[in-house]
Amino acid sequence: MKIEAITGSEAEAFHRMGSQASHRYDEFVDLLVGAGIADGQTVVDLCCGSGELEVILSSRFPSLNLVGVDLSEDMVRIAREYAAEQGKALEFRHGDAQLLAGMEDLAGKADLVVSRNAFHRLTRLPAAFDTMLRLAKPGGAVLNCSFIHPSDFDESGFRAWVTFLNQRPWDSEMQIVWALAHHYAPRLDDYREALAQAARETPVSEQRVWIDDQGYGVPTVKCFARRAAA
């Protein structure tokens, strides 16, 4: 069982957690810097949730052209409201990361296409990576960070996961949601094959998939690729 859209009270709960723990985005922002993010670029965030990353990036890189896309209309609404509260004029759209529909105007134009802690919820992982690569311009990069199945953790990673699960300041419902997100998450090899499959349709000059716990405290999978130059 996988739920693609986060709606209602669950969407509100995810926003509360994200807005109260902005430091947990530091690692991902560092990865974006390593991928070459810079002012003036176009950046598309698939499965953007309630917009915390967009607010953070727009503060650090004021002239970014940011577009957040999420399947949940509730998340898009929350993201727009949150950005306005923070004094940010940001664009958020309703759309499915597994389809290019609604994002055709961005195809081949993004310097960087990103997604954070969301692809483990999707039912068509290769299609999501295909969307990322099709949105990227030639020479542009894609970067995804997602949960992995606990069977891919080593002993220290599993201990870190249990500690994180027990120590987060959330209610029992969100604790269960977070645990189930890992239970239904893809394996490391699933991510590798999904990215490789997408790269067969849209050629890349480099691709890499790895696991680490840098910054977040729990092992996550990182998937990076750069679309081949024209």
From Swiss-Prot:
Can the keyword Ion transport be found in this entry's annotation? no
TM ranges are: none
Which EC number(s) are documented for this chain?
Answer: 2.1.1.284
Top-rank taxon of the source lineage equals Bacteria
Q: Mind listing the GO biological process terms from this record?
A: methylation; novobiocin biosynthetic process
Q: Does the keyword Heme apply?
A: no
What the entry lists under InterPro entries is as follows:
Methyltransf_25 (IPR041698), SAM-dependent_MTases_sf (IPR029063)
Please provide the record's keywords in A-Z order: Antibiotic biosynthesis, Methyltransferase, S-adenosyl-L-methionine, Transferase
Query: What reactions does this protein catalyze?
Result: 8-desmethylnovobiocic acid + S-adenosyl-L-methionine = novobiocic acid + S-adenosyl-L-homocysteine + H(+)
Q: What does this protein do?
A: C-methyltransferase that methylates 8-demethylnovobiocic acid to produce novobiocic acid in the novobiocin biosynthesis pathway. Novobiocin is an aminocoumarin family antibiotic that targets bacterial DNA gyrases.
Tell me one GO molecular function of this protein. 8-demethylnovobiocic acid C8-methyltransferase activity
Q: In which pathway does it act?
A: Antibiotic biosynthesis; novobiocin biosynthesis
State the protein's name.
Answer: 8-demethylnovobiocic acid C(8)-methyltransferase
Q: Which organism is it from?
A: Streptomyces niveus
Q: Which family does it belong to?
A: Belongs to the methyltransferase superfamily.
